[in-house]
Amino acid sequence: MDREYGTFQKPKKVRIVVEKCPKNEAGRACHCHEVGQVFTFDFEQCPQDFCAAAFHSLWPQLRVLELGGRHPWDSQEGVTRVACPDPGKPTIFRIETYEED
């Protein structure tokens, strides 16, 4: 790598898809997200209307995929799943890279 100019690959486009929103013991699901919602991540900021606590837990995984990495537990390249930190109703997010048309 050339430290003066950098020879980094262009970051990949990443989107976040809400896969599961389980209900807690009181029968309430996540108040921020619904199954099927899709958010585009642009590295600059948390997507609008996205739960800040969930985003904080997704951030490291977003960066791994954006920079072309892969976790040892991922079965598919460019895709990982992460749960929000709410222990009562952990929303599951699929993070995936994509090509822009």
Q: What spans do the regions from the language model cover?
A:
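A short beta-strand micro-motif
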Residues: 13-20
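Short, charged beta-turn/beta-strand-edge "cap" motif at the junction between a beta-strand
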Residues: 21-23, 44-49
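Short, compositionally biased
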Residues: 51-69
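Short, compact, well-ordered microdomains
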Residues: 67-101
